[in-house]
Amino acid sequence: MSASEDHGMSASEEPDMSASEGPDMSASEPETSLVSIGEPGSTHDVGVYGAPRPAVPERVPLAPRTKGCASGAGSLGAVEPGEFRRLPPWLKIQLPGSGEYAETKALLKANRLVTVCEEARCPNLGHCWARGTATIMILGELCTRRCGFCAVAPGRPNGHVDWDEPRRVGETVAAMNLRHTVITSVARDDLKDGGSTIFAEVIREIRKRSGTVIEVLIPDFRGHADDLRRVIDARPEVINHNIETVERLHPVVRPSARYDRSLELLRRVADSGTEIKAKSGIMVGLGETDAEMTRTLADLRAHGCQLLTIGQYLRPSKMHLPVVEYVHPDRFAAWRDEALAMGFESVASGPLVRSSYHADLLAGTVKPGEASKAG
């Protein structure tokens, strides 16, 4: 990304972060054109995104605007299809460059490990790596799904598994001396177990070498209870599975996932008979309404979710779903208060919040102001 000298992205056009593109899978998956998707709302033409992501719909269903929408955002809040987009001032980011950043990058490279920070082009990469933290992504760099929001490359891993990866992850976590470790993965629908065996092995290898708190951010394993149980039995402290968006938008945003299936996964974690905390995340700015957000928060809480993140969706490239709205920080604060009132244990809600952002603080591994290293 380009940025001004104050290390922000103020007064610039929405970035095209499509430096690396996934393989063209158009031969096997026809292009989708969404005409309408439930109530409320209508569809607005947002143009054709083109290869190599032909499965991303051409239209995004927008709900009617309600009072308070983009409160305080002025002309920077709502984004109409095709218009010149300026990132609002609250979306400034820190560019990488500290010594800790360089050390983290070198250690991960030496152990041939991939981070979701890089693959998903997270806006917090500079901030987190400067703290000596990173979220390690296992099971390769190709995802068997093609969600309209995600920057991770889609592809066909063809069953490949690096069975030495758990050892390398364990050694890296120990070398980084982390208090809180986050492990995630691409979706691996090509594997019979969805990758759950590797998740469990990674947890065990970390336990051999470190007393760190372990958080895993997992796919839905296609709803297979045995695969989820395999991860639960490895006993991480936190299991995170992101609901991502409101139910109405799931067919567009997460076409290979299901809203009810994600809720059921969280319920199984909460009812597992362990002390594992269930965590989830929502990204906003895709056309959801406040009423839909309230329902989603209530659904998550009713299914045992204890920890929650809410952040702004940022379009990784022109081939991904467009941003409908840059949500003002005041609304993030309101959603945080609403979620806490529903009984969530801890909530991180803000424009630049992501699933693993300050995960140690959210899970209570450390208290605000304490020296912390989380991965």
Per-region residue spans from a language model:
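Short cysteine clusters
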Residues: 122, 143, 147-150
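Conserved glycine-rich "GG(E/T)P / GGGxP" loop and the immediately following alpha-helix
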Residues: 181-201, 287-292
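Glycine-rich, proline-tolerant flexible connector loops at the mouths of alpha/beta enzymes
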Residues: 185-193, 247-254, 317-319
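Iron-sulfur (Fe-S) cluster-binding segments and ferredoxin-like electron-carrier domains
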Residues: 126-137, 149-164
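Short, ordered loop/turn segments at secondary-structure junctions
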Residues: 186-188, 219, 243-246, 312-313, ...
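Conserved alpha-helical substructure of the radical SAM core
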Residues: 154-181
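Auxiliary Fe-S-binding modules of radical SAM enzymes
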Residues: 2-9, 13-14, 24-135, 167, ...
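Hydrophobic residues within beta-strands of alpha/beta enzymes
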Residues: 181-183, 214, 239-241, 308, ...
